[in-house]
Amino acid sequence: MNNFKLCVPCLLGLEGPIADELRRMKMQNVQNENGRVYFTGGAKEIAKANINLRIGERVLLELGRFRAETFDELFEKTKALPWEMLIPRDAAFPVKGYSLNSKLFSVSDCQKIIKKAIVERLKSVYGIEWFAETAETYQIQFSIMKDVASLCIDTSGEGLHKRGYRPAHNAAPLKETMAAAMVSLSRYRGREDFCDPFCGSGTIPIEAALIAKNCAPGLKRDFSAMRWRSLDKSVWQLEREEAVSREFNGNYNIIGTDIDPTALDIARENAVRAGVSDIVRFEKADATKFDRVTENGIIVTNPPYGERIMEKQEAEQLYRLFGEAWRKTENWKLYLLSSHTEFERTFGKTADKKRKLYNGMIKCDLFMYLQ
């Protein structure tokens, strides 16, 4: 495998930060599209991206992209792709995907057509009539948007937000990839004090610690493509070793606070599993009484929305009181994620900047107060 078109799907609004990540990794031909970022590479780049990406959802290998308005078109164009380059005769190759604003809108029918086309292709190449599918898995992932089909093989397996440090969490968790995106957008690099006053199970402070230490988020997990016979397995160990060699050691002041002692216990356990318990501390504190005074600091936080945990009125009261407390501090920049359409009015101050993001299916804004 020398040069494939690779794709990182992402939540809308995060294409730019992911493209920046890939360019810092020296990836080639980085290009943004809505909800995905493309680049090119082979085995080394697949391993590097999976191990090091903080914000992307997974790494897909795109084998083909074409227009398909009929099932016949979908079948013939899928069958024409060189699936045998990657999929051995005994491998499993399940198919899943989605369709949006397309003539081929039945996902289950598209799944069957794509599966049949790949089977027919491999039957003709391998000269066999039946596939046991008992060996390693090559997950086929398709998307059909505005009648354009993209056919990929998933190299990641579980989503890249699964870092391996959070088997337990409290209610309404923030995905690790979104937490990392928020920290990255704050430009925190370990030099200032850092605080999340609504830390819950600790995802934001833990991701901040991983960024401060330049610790690759995928070091503690496996990836689907590690088991592929078509990939050089040695690249994974080499990329892990290279990632470890780039880690920093320093003195960091990273704090997570919450009023829920159970959530704090979970946060401490997660920090231990993430390998950052030595540089992150968790304390019981009321965010509405926030009073930290230092030369400079960054707050990155995701307070309750009033949509899932708290009622809207309670959330508004929380925003108002936290806003009053924050305005009494000096030199603390604030990056706060909320879906509340009247957040700035409730908080008591207009943001210097805003960025639209999606937390799961919830449309949010990242409100940036730069003081």
Question: Which residues fall in each region the model found?
Answer:
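Non-catalytic nucleic-acid substrate-recognition regions in nucleic-acid-modifying enzymes
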Residues: 2-136
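Short beta-strand/turn micro-motifs composed of small residues
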Residues: 10, 258, 338
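Class I S-adenosyl-L-methionine
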Residues: 98, 145-185
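A short, flexible beta-alpha/helix-coil linker loop
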Residues: 100-103, 159, 304-308
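Conserved S-adenosyl-L-methionine
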Residues: 174-291, 307-308, 313-314
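C-terminal catalytic and target-recognition region of SAM-dependent MTase-like enzymes
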Residues: 285-371
